Amino acid sequence: MDEVPSERDAFAWLLSENIELGEEEPKIAAAINEQLAHMELTSHDEFTLRRIRDVAIRHDPKKIIEVGGGIGHLTAWLLDAFSSKVDKPEYTIVEGGNKFAAILLRLTQRFNASDWVRVSGMRFQELAGESKAWLLSNQALLNSNSMEATGAPASLPADLIIIDVGELEQVECIQESLPLLSKNGLILTVEPNVPFEGASEEESNRFQLWMDLIRDIQETYRIGFVPLKKTTLVAIMSK
């Protein structure tokens, strides 16, 4: 009889490369990457984006929250992958302010995803506050087999939350995300850069906040680090 894999082995498999999905950048994502260069904006490299997509598809979430949509580079990778599935997830893209909202809305239309994807212009910290209140007030309905909770401010409880914000808000957004996860919910983010010699005190303090976060949650959450070509992908899931 085949041996049942350990939780550690299953977690490692979840975070591994999915060769079935291919390596080529989706056409719409490639066009957005060119647009980023023209706008002098940055995004994650292709290796990082591909692995986030691989893990997201393998995890098979029913409800997704993407925090920090920008102009949709990562979003395009994910929509390209999920749009081919028969059962679409409920997907919320959070991009504080209305600067890129119109771009993200047009992107969802290009994938014919307007009926299963919504764009929120709220700051994530504010949306998370509303989400926690909604989860608390609808706890009985969420545990019911015969009744359904409605009116959620985001895709809740979330099976997958992707934190793709600057290092200034990263730790706070992760902390706000933890209560929004479903039982087997997963957080994906990219590890902040280790401060180099001569870095400012602010940069050093910011990385210390990251280290403190990892230390504080490691007893109750399984944390995986996936070294990639240019970044390290970090996954957080309840034990």
Show the residue positions of the predicted features.
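Rossmann-like AdoMet
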Residues: 1-50, 54-60, 89
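Conserved class I S-adenosyl-L-methionine
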Residues: 60-71
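Glycine-rich SAM-binding Motif I of class I
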Residues: 72-76
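Helix-to-beta-strand junctions that scaffold the AdoMet/dcAdoMet cofactor pocket
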Residues: 82-87, 181-183
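Conserved SAM-binding motif I beta-strand of class I
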Residues: 87-96
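Hydrophobic/aromatic anchor residues within beta-strands of the central parallel beta-sheet
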Residues: 91, 118-119, 187
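S-adenosyl-L-methionine
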Residues: 97-156, 168
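C-terminal substrate-binding/active-site "lid" region of AdoMet-derived donor-dependent transferases
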Residues: 149-154, 167-239
